[in-house]
Curated annotation (Swiss-Prot):
Catalytically driven reaction(s): S-adenosyl 3-(methylsulfanyl)propylamine + putrescine = S-methyl-5'-thioadenosine + spermidine + H(+)
Any one GO cellular component localisation term in the record: cytosol
Encoding gene per record: speE
Main function: Catalyzes the irreversible transfer of a propylamine group from the amino donor S-adenosylmethioninamine (decarboxy-AdoMet) to putrescine (1,4-diaminobutane) to yield spermidine.
Enzyme kind, highest EC tier: transferase
Name by which UniProt lists this protein: Polyamine aminopropyltransferase
Subunit structure and binding partners: Homodimer or homotetramer.
Domain PABS, residue spans: 5-238
Organism per entry: Salmonella typhimurium (strain LT2 / SGSC1412 / ATCC 700720)
Keywords, in A-Z order: Cytoplasm, Polyamine biosynthesis, Spermidine biosynthesis, Transferase
């Protein structure tokens, strides 16, 4: 791709977004996907896979703070964390901020993504790949959760959209495997798209997860990069109390963890579980 051109996202057929490409840092098709990292004056470094924006330097903190601190602080004493995907390292960066976590395992299908991001998105991973608690496994996520002998307190599925390599991370086989290696009282969370535009994806995840977990729901965050604005995250556990903890409990845990965030705070934590009526109606109708 030439510099000083427009890059168009291909996620939706009838509408979408574009970015001015100021400088192409890397563009290559790996064994699994078409990866590009380029610079944009407004959003900094942008990474896209198969024509779909995955992350930008400017607003990645919103996504990664909400995907990590919500389940980890709701759990309260997570020792072992599993990240599925997350090759850019930003999810790992946020998990490493929790000093009580003892082991962090990341399963990434494409070793190339990890090496590219270490070089081209250093602000995302911020040295977290060198954390002594971290183990990288190059494997398919579905295979890992169905074969591993390890168990985890929190599982974070930092998946792409349900197309291409990411499609398997929205299947019953994956959700069943996650339940299999989740400790009692553990929490599973996953990226679930922009619900206003991808509602079927959320409904499908809810239906499948409900076969394996007694408490299944969603929480949300406003992330500008993802077209449509409001990103939905799947939430699944067998402890329904964890979704309804008091603000005092979350505040105490937040303070004890010594976290200083740019988006997440205890009030946002509670508010994130308030869902729009159209989603409530759709869930009730299925």
């Amino acid at each position: 791709m030439a510099e000083n051109t427009m890059w168009h996202e291909t996620l939706h057929d009838q509408f979408g977004q574009y970015f001015a490409v100021d400088n192409v840092l890397y563009h290559e098709k790996t064994d699994h996907q078409d990866l590009i990292i380029f610079e944009n004056a407004a959003f900094g470094r942008v990474m896209a896979l198969d024509g779909v924006v995955q992350t930008t330097e400017r607003d990645e903190f919103i996504y990664h703070e909400m995907m990590t601190h919500v389940p980890l602080l709701a759990h309260g004493h997570a020792k072992h964390v599993l990240i599925i995907g997350g090759g850019d390292g930003a999810m790992l960066r946020e998990v490493t901020r929790h000093k009580n976590v003892e082991t962090i395992t990341m399963v990434e299908i494409d070793a190339g993504v990890v090496s590219f991001c270490r070089q081209y998105l250093p602000n995302h991973n911020a040295g977290s790949y060198d954390d002594p608690r971290f183990t990288l496994v190059i494997d398919d996520g579905v295979n890992f959760v169905n074969q591993t002998h390890q168990t985890f307190d929190v599982i974070i599925s930092d998946c792409t959209d349900p197309i291409g390599p990411g499609e398997s991370l929205f299947t019953s086989a994956f959700y069943e495997g996650c339940k299999r290696c989740l400790n009692p009282g553990g929490i599973f969370v996953a990226q679930n798209g922009v619900c206003f535009l991808q509602q079927d994806e959320a409904l499908d995840s809810h239906r499948k997860l409900s076969h394996y977990f007694s408490d299944v729901g969603f929480y949300q965050a406003a992330i500008p990069t993802y077209y449509g604005g409001i990103m939905t995250f799947a939430w699944a556990t067998d402890n329904d109390a964890l979704r309804h903890l008091s603000s005092e409990i979350i505040q105490a845990r937040f303070h004890a963890a010594g976290l200083k965030c740019r988006y997440y705070n205890p009030a946002i934590h509670a508010a994130a579980f308030a869902l729009p009526q159209y989603l409530h109606d759709a869930l009730s109708a299925q």
